[in-house]
């Protein structure tokens, strides 16, 4: 009997590769350190190239199947639509409007719902073992052993490291590779509003869009819909900007080495800085000194991970292959990590299908296909954060150019 493929991590990439392998009758087991009730209820943006790859791999499922299962506004019959408009968070005025004829190419997805939907997209149940925190990986391609802190030990043909930016697999196999901290400030808040209050406070500004994107002078304050229930709306917000810290200046909000406990505390400097921004409604009604202590607030430290081809080749000899953030983590704000994690999982599963007898060739083929895409994505993600946090004068210039182009297009049409 062929030893199973051992997948470390039950996030998006781990569940996706497991689901596709299971659908192809390739034995595999997913190991997850946390308990089944863990929550990552925030929403993410799925781009068309990401969800199309996933839907195709799951048997050419229609897009509506996905949106019915994962869209934050699915209870209203929504499709996770966002208008991609940018508004001045000081005045509330529309700065950059999208082309009204543009096709929807981004779907917002509730992360919890997406994990469930992926796991359920097949006849046979995926095998997930919760409460299994990895201790060690040993062996070579075709014969690897994973040992867990609870004493469990499993032999497999291959270990797929799908365990994120702080990958336990990577820290053992490639201990010299550690995440780089990106010098940016990101605070993330979660809250819940009664439906009526949401309809009165947010809907007049956002309309049917699942994101109300507010930009300021070098800082952003998006408000996003995470999930809508019959009685309440779960929202989150972010306050983000580049760090101002240098040798002469200390940035009180840039805390790259903050502990897990400290990351959940609201620093007084955050309240002071937000108060100084003079935000317009509805941002001012959520982001203020009275409201913030009632929210769940987190200081997100943005990290990137990059590896060399020599690194992954060395890991391959030890029977390990990487997918998702374990080998190409990107900043949460402005990155496309979730999409690349899905595509990684699809491409690795495709490479493995029918090649169980030649795992080395399958893994090499996967890296050959994914390498350039992932390396360029990490590089772009660093640049994208700063592009999304421009000075207001640049946003105004962009807005004027778009107005001129729209006017010229209108003249040409007549």
From Swiss-Prot:
Highest rank taxon of the organism: Eukaryota
Pathway as given in its UniProt record: Secondary metabolite biosynthesis
Stored Pfam families: FAD_binding_3
Swiss-Prot/TrEMBL cofactor(s): FAD
Record keywords, A-Z: FAD, Flavoprotein, Monooxygenase, Oxidoreductase
EC number per UniProt: 1.-.-.-
Stored SUPFAM superfamilies: FAD/NAD(P)-binding domain
Molecular function as annotated in GO: FAD binding; monooxygenase activity
Residues given in the record as FAD binding sites: 32, 43, 115, 325, 338
Listed InterPro entries: FAD-bd, FAD/NAD-bd_sf
Catalytic activity: 3-(2,4-dioxopentyl)-3,6,8,9-tetrahydroxy-1-oxo-1,2,3,4-tetrahydroanthracene-2-carboxyl-[ACP] + NADPH + O2 + H(+) = 3-(2,4-dioxopentyl)-2,3,6,8,9-pentahydroxy-1-oxo-1,2,3,4-tetrahydroanthracene-2-carboxyl-[ACP] + NADP(+) + H2O
Transmembrane segments: none
Protein family per UniProt: Belongs to the paxM FAD-dependent monooxygenase family.
Function: FAD-dependent monooxygenase; part of the gene cluster that mediates the biosynthesis of the linear tetracyclic TAN-1612 neuropeptide Y receptor antagonist. The decaketide backbone of TAN-1612 is synthesized by the non-reducing polyketide synthase adaA via condensation of one acetyl-CoA starter unit with 9 malonyl-CoA units. The FAD-dependent monooxygenase adaC then performs hydroxylation at C2 while the polaketide chain is still attached to the NRPKS adaA.
Name of protein: FAD-dependent monooxygenase adaC
Native source species: Aspergillus niger (strain ATCC MYA-4892 / CBS 513.88 / FGSC A1513)
């Amino acid at each position: 009997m062929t030893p199973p493929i051992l997948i470390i991590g039950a996030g998006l990439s781990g569940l996706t590769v497991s689901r596709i392998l299971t659908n192809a009758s390739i034995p595999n087991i997913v190991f997850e350190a946390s308990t089944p009730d863990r929550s990552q209820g925030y929403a993410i943006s799925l781009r068309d190239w990401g969800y199309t790859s996933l839907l195709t791999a799951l048997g050419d499922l229609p897009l509506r199947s996905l949106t019915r299962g994962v869209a934050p506004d699915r209870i209203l019959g929504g499709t996770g639509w966002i208008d991609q408009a940018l508004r001045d968070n000081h005045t509330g005025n529309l700065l950059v409007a999208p082309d009204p004829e543009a096709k929807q190419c981004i779907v917002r997805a509730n992360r919890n719902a997406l994990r469930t939907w992926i796991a359920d997209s097949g006849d046979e149940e995926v095998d997930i073992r919760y409460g299994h925190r990895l201790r060690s990986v040993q062996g070579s391609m075709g014969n690897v052993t994973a040992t867990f802190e609870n004493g469990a030990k499993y032999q497999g043909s291959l270990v797929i490291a799908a365990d994120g930016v702080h990958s336990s697999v990577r820290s053992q196999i490639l201990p010299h590779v550690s995440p780089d901290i990106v010098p940016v400030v990101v605070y993330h808040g979660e809250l819940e509003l009664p439906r009526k209050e949401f309809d009165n406070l947010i809907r007049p500004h956002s309309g049917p869009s699942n994101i109300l994107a507010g930009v300021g002078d070098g800082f952003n304050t998006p408000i996003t819909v995470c999930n809508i229930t019959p009685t309440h709306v779960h929202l989150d917000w972010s306050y983000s900007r580049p760090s101002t810290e240098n040798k002469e200046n200390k940035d009180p909000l840039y805390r790259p080495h903050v502990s897990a406990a400290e990351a959940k505390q609201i620093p007084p400097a955050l309240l002071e800085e937000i108060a100084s921004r003079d935000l317009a409604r509805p941002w001012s009604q959520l982001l203020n000194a009275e409201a913030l202590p009632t929210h769940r607030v987190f200081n997100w430290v943005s990290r990137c991970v990059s590896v060399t081809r020599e690194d992954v080749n060395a890991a391959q000899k030890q029977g390990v292959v990487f997918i998702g953030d374990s080998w190409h983590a990107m900043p949460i704000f402005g990155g496309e990590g979730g999409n690349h994690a899905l595509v990684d999982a699809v491409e690795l599963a495709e490479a493995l299908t029918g090649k169980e007898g030649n795992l080395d060739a399958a893994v090499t083929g996967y890296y050959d296909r994914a390498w350039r895409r992932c390396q360029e994505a990490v590089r772009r993600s660093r640049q994208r954060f700063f592009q999304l946090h421009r000075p207001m004068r640049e946003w105004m210039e962009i807005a004027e150019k778009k107005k001129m182009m729209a006017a010229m297009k209108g003249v040409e049409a007549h």
